[in-house]
Swiss-Prot record:
This is Inositol monophosphatase 1. One of its GO terms (biological process) is signal transduction. It holds the Pfam family Inositol_P. Homodimer. Mg(2+) 1 binds at residues 70, 90, 92. GO terms for molecular function: fructose-1-phosphatase activity; glucose-1-phosphatase activity; glucose-6-phosphatase activity; glycerol-2-phosphatase activity; inositol monophosphate 1-phosphatase activity; inositol monophosphate 3-phosphatase activity; inositol monophosphate 4-phosphatase activity; inositol monophosphate phosphatase activity. It catalyses: a myo-inositol phosphate + H2O = myo-inositol + phosphate; 1D-myo-inositol 1-phosphate + H2O = myo-inositol + phosphate; 1D-myo-inositol 2-phosphate + H2O = myo-inositol + phosphate; 1D-myo-inositol 3-phosphate + H2O = myo-inositol + phosphate. Its EC number is 3.1.3.25, 3.1.3.94.
Length: 277
């Protein structure tokens, strides 16, 4: 039987590449930076332009499909995930990197049907790396099959996380305390690339063993989550329970052993869900 969503995935790859070209061209120029929820939650005209370009192109081809887009939500639309085929889009994951020309920025597209992710596309455009995964078909980077690492010993692991965009003292205290706890186990190291999608793709490649973060949004992880699982990894909630796309928290790891150990060590930050008003 033909794959009903393969055409959508092929189109997503084409659009991500086109969007990446726009982003890479714009990164060379001076940009007008605006603020969203805080002085460090940044948005540029390119974020907005790329999202509009992606959504209008998809709407034209698939008029019955739904959308959740980072900049649409910032403009007042709701993050409601229904059973309808839904494109979950982050036009520039790593906007702060983009503003500073730090070369890790990604176009991220996740596609859900019946609230389950069917495929993910993450284009790390400055690097020229196209990460893709289709449910049940494996994960790839530029056509090369991906496989997570086999490391089960946390003391020999390399972790990835982010400090996040919150500057609330209590949140910052928990973020730093969690890093300190993990760092002193000890782990081999903790890295931050500045984009959740690329961090997760690094777990899929085996370059990092696990990634965790609280405060991310569904559009940060919808594309990359399936890339991790199709490369043999696991997604988990930071409490150790099942991963929930709308919960704003995630552990993406090479295996359950590392994921559960990280969940055991970290304090949970209370957050409003993406699908709450």
């Amino acid at each position: 039987m033909a794959d009903p969503w393969q055409e959508c995935m092929d189109y997503a790859v084409t659009l991500a590449r086109q969007a990446g070209e726009v982003v890479c061209e714009a990164i060379k120029n001076e940009m007008n930076v605006m603020l969203k929820s805080s002085p460090v939650d940044l948005v540029t005209a390119t974020d907005q332009k790329v999202e509009k370009m992606l959504i209008s192109s998809i709407k034209e081809k698939y008029p019955s499909h739904s959308f959740i887009g980072e900049e649409s939500v910032a403009a007042g639309e709701k993050s409601i995930l229904t059973d309808n085929p839904t494109w979950i889009i982050d036009p520039i994951d790593g906007t702060t990197n983009f503003v500073h020309r730090f070369p890790f920025v990604a176009v991220s597209i996740g596609f859900a049907v019946n609230k389950k992710i069917e495929f993910g596309v993450v284009y790390s455009c400055v690097e020229g790396k196209m990460y893709t995964a289709r449910k049940g078909k494996g994960a790839f980077c530029n056509g090369q099959k991906l496989q997570v690492s086999q490391q089960e010993d946390i003391t020999k692991s390399l972790l990835v996380t982010e400090l996040g965009s919150s500057r609330t003292p209590e949140t910052v205290r928990i973020v730093l305390s969690n890093m300190e706890k993990l760092f002193c186990i000890p782990v081999h190291g903790i890295r931050s690339v500045g984009t959740a999608a690329v961090n997760m793709c690094l777990v899929a490649t085996g370059g990092a063993d696990a990634y965790y973060e609280m405060g991310i949004h569904c559009w940060d992880v919808a594309g990359a989550g399936i890339i991790v699982t199709e490369a043999g990894g696991v997604l988990m909630d930071v409490t150790g329970g099942p991963f929930d796309l709308m919960s704003r928290r995630v552990i993406a790891a090479n295996n359950r052993i590392l994921a559960e150990r990280i969940a055991k060590e970290i304090q949970v930050i209370p957050l409003q869900r993406d699908d709450e008003d």
